[in-house]
Amino acid sequence: MSAALDQSSSAPVTPSALARRTLLRRFAALGAGSVTLQRALADETAKTGRLTDAQISNAEWIAGLTLSQADREVLIRSGESLLAELQQLRAVKLEPAALSCLRFDPEIADPAAREAGRTPAPWLVSPAADFVRVEPPGEVTDESLPWLPIRTLAVLLRTGRLTSERLVQLSLTRLKSADPQLLCVVSLLEESALAAARQADAELKAGHDRGLLHGIPWGAKDLLAVAGTKTTWGAPQYRDRVLEQTATVATRLAAAGAVLVAKLTTGALAMGDQWFGGKTRNPWNTEEGSSGSSAGSASAVSAGLVPFAIGSETLGSIVSPTKRCGVAGLRPTFGRISRGGCMPLSWSMDKLGPIARTADDLGIILAATHGSDSLDPCSVDRWFAWPQQVDLSRLRVGRVRNAKVQPAEQAALDHLQAIGANIIDIELPRSDSDDAITVMLEAEACEVFRELSDAGTTEGLNAWPRIFQKARFVSAADYLHASRMRLQLMQKMAALFRTVDLYVGGDDLVITNLTGHPCIALPVLLQEQQPEPRVVCCTLTAGLYDEASLLALAKLIESRADVLKYHPSLKSAPLEKK
């Protein structure tokens, strides 16, 4: 049992109990037989402070094992040496931001992806003139502006019908107004946002155009560091912390002229929608949470508070809340967007991605944020350009047969069939052991937050204390065994993508977060639910680095689905923020 959980109990913590916990961790690291034997050895050794032959014998009896005398002698000699080394190792304190030397590479199972990622996919073609045609509204009102896509807002900014200052002020006003119902805001950056908006207006007027995001407000999931602002990671332990660094993705968006207006909520340490201020809500039904952990990002975009936001995903944290809140979200290929300056959770699984209103919006944001960065050794430069169109005659779309087809997924398949897509039945490489591979995530997260766990300061961290406790018993051998199983899963997915180019649905969050494949959640269907009808999403998944195909196909489906005109009414009563 970890110190974190022991200290949460009402029983006093004695020196012998502390010794037992320490020894238990060390015997687990040593790999000394079963967990039962490790516990027994810890109990016996805590009594005298050293490991003896007699104590090993007693521990064998408790564990129901029999060791030879030679095994006992080896255990004593090697155990004492290793425990001394581990004491030295664990005495070194590391900040959560300290990187691991191990680098996850999604291409390792599919060497062809490395070359394929340097050029456009063969089914991509230059877009027709009307593919991203903009039809500005006849009247620009505060009621219509929150729901307009980025490309339309960009036209209004450049034709003098809108200023960035007005757009940013509207976003700030809406964030203030809706937050009591949604609990989606950690910090409003009013002063800096308005200053940046005025600068954007001046630059555009002078002909200095930074691109389509110039003057567009956005929100950051509060695990992105931004110098001079609170970066809380959703955890009470960090609720007043200010970091003096800025995440690479925020720096790139600033260079593109986008205006940061708010830090948005994340579930505590990137889990769920519960943070130290309460539970972030779904604008379509404020009786339920927004899901997470990109809780505030999805909620704020869904409610029309910001045109777009940046979220992150380790095991569903972009896809899940965007599906819950009925907005578009892109989880790019692992390594596509730098995580520099962001809270780490799992070095081998963390990904950043945009949440917005349309597929075109997502493409615009990805174009401004992707690419390698010295602060993230896993980040890479791979080809991406937007907009693109797909030649449907050359594209193979998979329909997953070994997963339940949800109504939104069937709607997407129906739209694809109607436009002549080549649909092929496939089966995902599922195994009962897939979930077990996520022990890698748990072990990495346990190490990132080792000091919190060791100190027992884990109050308000959702299920993390239990996960940290469990991860203490994951040996290095277990971690490496899981990594080998993960590679086999990656190889199976590489083989699958030799038969199709994309697939719809599949209930595959565990699989594709382990393999690093890109996925988009896309609103496609208006579904009757209580308290009001809501927009629901399907998912599309593509080969490594093929976000352009994902977005191009998503845009075709989006144009036929015609659900972007529906918005949540947000009529609930205010909630109490903690």
Residue ranges and their predicted role:
Residues M1-L18:
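N-terminal secretory signal peptides
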Residues A129-P136, R331-E409, R560-K578:
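A short helix-breaking turn/cap at a secondary-structure junction
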Residues Q245-T369, N513-L525, Q530-T539:
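Short glycine/serine-rich loop segments
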Residues F131-E143, L213-W233, D391-V400, A436-L487, ...:
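Short helix-loop capping/hinge segments that flank enzyme active sites or metal/cofactor-binding pockets
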Residues G160, G215, A255, V259-V261, ...:
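Glycine-rich, small-residue loops and helix-cap segments
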Residues R161, R166-Q169, R198-A202, W386-P387, ...:
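Acyltransferase
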Residues L67-L315, D414:
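Gly/Ser-rich catalytic/binding loops embedded in alpha/beta enzyme cores
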Residues S16-R25, G33-K47:
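N-terminal twin-arginine translocation
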